[in-house]
């Protein structure tokens, strides 16, 4: 950086020069730009080919902005699906439209608690439609501060606070995410790839099991579909999907810093509070002529045995109804 010679006033009173010149180096800028563009294109194409080679394909990212776009599609008389991944994957919008005469709006989310969305719809004075709520007790009765509750709360918060820039960004992302496989945010980021390194956990570490990578696609209506490889009998991906749920739903041991009886009492109190809050939300919806249908979707084998043991029907489902 080359500065001009200080003026007489600056020499007397001090202070740096107020102007400077920065000469541009005489290098082949056009050629350098072409090289950079070629490197970026080559790297992008190579990464895309690699992602497709390991099984990935183009799909929309399930984020708060996409959820918000569907939430905005809810009309006063809409049929709305809320809850967890069972209501997300197990319900086909085309078939429901044929049977119900109206196309539902899909607001269920993987690993999410349906209560924040239920409460938000209850507060919407204009809504008097029908809610189909998927219930997995461990998720639906999750206390505040847990990941299932936070997923629902973040989505509802984004609906009420989404900026025009965030909304425009989601619309601009559609054509790219529908064509490019490596834009899978939740699985192909550097942070996620580092977590996949086969490094053994230290002794006594309580690390949650990792979900299988890329087994479903998502469209602009948030319809979730499993990829074809999931249907191949005996495939590694199918086995991983089948075997992940028991360790994922197995509760961790109670904390050692509090007596077990006291801990269980707090859990019971939290569930009781959730029953009370659900009752208030349902009464608001009923008072406007709306309907709500609670559904437990089919599950079997070891997962059903685990859920029946940890969240028995008599303590969760029956009181809910």
Question: Model-found features: residue ranges?
Answer:
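N-terminal Lys/Arg-rich, disordered targeting/topogenic segments
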Residues: 1-30
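Hydrophobic membrane-insertion alpha-helices, especially the h-region
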Residues: 28-52
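Alpha-helical transmembrane signal-anchor/signal-peptide segments
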Residues: 52-75
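Loop/turn elements at helix/coil->beta-strand transitions in domains of secreted/extracellular proteins
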Residues: 76-78, 101-103, 127-130, 286-293
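Second-shell loop/turn segments in exported
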Residues: 81, 106-108, 264-271, 281, ...
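Membrane-embedded segments
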Residues: 82, 86-175
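Secreted/periplasmic serine-hydrolase-like ester/acetyl group-modifying domain
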Residues: 150-288
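Substrate-gating cap/lid alpha-helix
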Residues: 299-321
